[in-house]
């Protein structure tokens, strides 16, 4: 009986461990997807493409699974919250006002929910992106 109980316990522990391993792997890949979208946005330097890259990064990350979706939400929220903090110090045309932040979060959620990020793609953005 002790052997059976030990085997059941070990299988439960290993099952949970593999789920955490999978979640962490998805989260790391999702973080990489977010970084790639950010890098592409900086490289493209295309006016009006911000929301597209927000949606694309979140979409790509969420496609990885629950870990990727979690990473996308954490990174997106941190980015928007840090921009709100900088709003106190940067006035004028910083482009990080409350309206812009709400629009960014809407694009983030759009992508995370699995909807097509091309909805936000501006006309003329090179096909590379």
Swiss-Prot record:
Q: Per the annotation, which location comes first and is thus the protein's main one? A: secreted
- Which residues lie within the region annotated Disordered? 88-129
Signal peptide (from-to): 1-18
The Pyrrolidone carboxylic acid modification is found at 19
Query: Its biological function?
Result: Major acute phase reactant. Apolipoprotein of the HDL complex.
Family classification? Belongs to the SAA family.
Protein name in UniProt: Serum amyloid A protein
Which gene name does the record give? SAA1
